[in-house]
Curated annotation (Swiss-Prot):
Protein name: Small ribosomal subunit protein uS10
A Pfam family recorded for this sequence: Ribosomal_S10
Molecular functions per Gene Ontology: structural constituent of ribosome; tRNA binding
Annotated gene: rpsJ
Keywords: Ribonucleoprotein, Ribosomal protein
GO CC term, one of those recorded: ribonucleoprotein complex
Entry's family note: Belongs to the universal ribosomal protein uS10 family.
Gene3D superfamilies referenced in this protein's UniProt entry, alphabetically: Ribosomal protein S10 domain
Keyword flag Ribonucleoprotein: yes
Biological process annotations from GO: translation
Source domain of life: Bacteria
Keyword Hydrolase attributed: no
Length: 110
């Protein structure tokens, strides 16, 4: 039987770093239980978007409010993933605050 191996990149984004790390840990444990070799999690720089608005509606320019959104990002790489690993990852339940993007590369036989 010929097994098709693929390279998989799993990119995780979240506003809460605790949720993100917990999700990355569960993905890594699931992949290792299925027999995959795992690279990561690779930490990306935190992105901070700042919004500054006036407190008053008309005057008093010196009185302002600052808000920020911090976006945390991680990357997990599975260099040689087969169908059993993909099925195990598909059945994984992740929290609602985590954005998951999966990129599958290749399909070399062997």
């Amino acid at each position: 039987m010929v097994m098709v191996t693929q390279k998989i990149y799993i990119e995780l984004k979240a506003f809460d770093s605790y949720l993100l790390d917990r999700s990355a840990r569960s993905i890594i444990l699931t992949a290792k239980r299925s027999g995959a070799r795992v690279n990561g999690p690779i930490f990306f720089p935190r992105r901070v978007a700042k919004f500054i608005v006036n407190r008053s509606t008309h005057v008093d320019k010196k009185s302002r409010e600052q808000f920020e959104i911090r976006t945390h990002k991680r990357l997990i790489s599975l260099p040689k993933a087969n169908s059993t690993i993909i099925q195990a990852l598909m059945s994984l339940q992740l929290p609602a605050g985590v954005d998951v993007k999966v990129k599958v590369i290749g399909g070399s036989n062997g």
